[in-house]
């Protein structure tokens, strides 16, 4: 068991106050503190103190003895810690994104390598051959968009802006997946006068429309007034997660985080196809090829946890990670898994034991538990989040 020393990513959309208010993390230079990373991602691995008292990279520690630390099955299947665990603090909307599935990621990665596109090139889509499933768990009220609305709902929301673009009128005449695909691509392709006119019609509709999703469009327009992604809340479900609610983000499904603080767990991948609310490169043909144009009702988007005593287990449809919450009390309980785990203290305090070793976690602190250290004993007050594997 080792306490993690984690890095903060200072992306421009991050909150300058959330990590300080929630977890007392100092921010003397008033930087945006967008994401706290827990894991062994090559871009920014957590660090731990070794037996000699030196601070070393968790990635290097794992690399030196994968089977023991990750567990035999995970080491064989993934060859590394297969997940990245984050605290995400959004003060501004993030870009609308789509993550390709595993098969397309492998093909796209090989194709871009063969074409000699540098890894850091703006037009590079595939940074690795992996998929990027994600789970988001709200710590504060959390606003997001996820998946296409039911087509009948899109039709009624598009009525006030029917004249903004011919592709909108086409979809209204025949609301099916093919027309939605054309509409999605057409809105992203808009340039110059065509784009100005469409956005003017949308903004004029804002004057007469109340409630959602118009309120979300107003919020986004404060940050991206000239982005065609402003139409996206009319097409995608706007989801408000209450603290303690979670949502899984499937491959090939457009989504965006807009505002709030959440825990996020994902597979170790940087594969992102952008779809608006960004000044960055958008590869529209590649994006459209990787989107499933199917509706998903908003009431099916939340992940329903399964309660097992003091544990809440959130079912995850992939092997890359598992996620559960543990409510602590003075009564000792054990936490066990056949893999490595990262434990994060969400609130309160936790004491962990393994043999003669004892570790205390305060809110915002986290620990790495190697596979060969399972089970560990825990007690305290408040709540622990656990990310691990069920292989």
Curated annotation (Swiss-Prot):
Required co-factor? Zn(2+)
Q: Which UniProt keywords apply?
A: Acetylation, Cytoplasm, Isomerase, Metal-binding, Zinc
> Where does the protein end up?
Cytoplasm
The record, for Gene3D superfamilies, names: Jelly Rolls, Phosphomannose Isomerase, domain 2
Q: State the encoding gene.
A: manA
**Active-site residues, as the UniProt record annotates them:** 274
What name has this protein been given in UniProt? Answer: Mannose-6-phosphate isomerase
Entry-linked PROSITE patterns = PMI_I_1, PMI_I_2
Q: Name one GO molecular function term.
A: zinc ion binding
Name the enzyme's class: isomerase
List of residues that carry N6-acetyllysine: 280
């Amino acid at each position: 068991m080792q306490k993690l020393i984690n890095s903060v990513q200072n992306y421009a959309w991050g909150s300058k106050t959330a990590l300080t208010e929630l977890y007392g993390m100092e921010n003397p230079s008033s930087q945006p503190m967008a994401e706290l990373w827990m894991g062994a991602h090559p871009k920014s691995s957590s660090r731990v103190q070794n037996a000699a008292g030196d601070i070393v990279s968790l990635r290097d520690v794992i690399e030196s003895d994968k089977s023991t630390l990750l567990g035999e099955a995970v080491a064989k299947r993934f060859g590394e810690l297969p997940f990245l665990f984050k605290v995400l603090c959004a003060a501004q909307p993030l870009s609308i994104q789509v993550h390709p599935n595993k098969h397309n990621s492998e093909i796209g990665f090989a194709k871009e390598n063969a074409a000699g596109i540098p890894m850091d090139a703006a037009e590079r889509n595939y940074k690795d051959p992996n998929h990027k499933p994600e789970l988001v768990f709200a710590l504060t009220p959390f606003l997001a968009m996820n998946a296409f609305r039911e087509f009948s709902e899109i039709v009624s929301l598009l009525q006030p802006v029917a004249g903004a673009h011919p592709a909108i009128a086409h979809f209204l005449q025949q609301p099916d997946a093919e027309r939605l695909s054309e509409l999605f691509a057409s809105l992203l392709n808009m340039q110059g006068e065509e784009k100005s006119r469409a956005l003017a019609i949308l903004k004029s509709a804002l004057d007469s429309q109340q409630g959602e999703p118009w309120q979300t469009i107003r919020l986004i327009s404060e940050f991206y007034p000239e982005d065609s992604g402003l139409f996206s809340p009319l097409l995608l479900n706007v989801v408000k997660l209450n603290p303690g609610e979670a949502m899984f983000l499937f491959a090939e499904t457009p989504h965006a985080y807009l505002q709030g603080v959440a825990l996020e767990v994902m597979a170790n991948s940087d594969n992102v196809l952008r779809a608006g609310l960004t000044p960055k490169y958008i590869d529209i043909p590649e994006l459209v090829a990787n989107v499933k144009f199917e509706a998903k009702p908003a009431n099916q988007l939340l992940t329903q946890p399964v309660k097992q005593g003091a544990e809440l287990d959130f079912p995850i449809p992939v092997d890359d990670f598992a996620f559960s919450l543990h409510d602590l009390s003075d009564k000792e309980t054990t936490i066990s898994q056949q893999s490595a785990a990262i434990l994060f203290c969400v609130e309160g305090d936790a004491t962990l034991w393994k043999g003669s070793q004892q570790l205390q976690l305060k809110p915002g602190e986290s620990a790495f538990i190697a596979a060969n250290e399972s089970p560990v004993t825990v007690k305290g007050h408040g709540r622990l989040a656990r990310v691990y594997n069920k292989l």
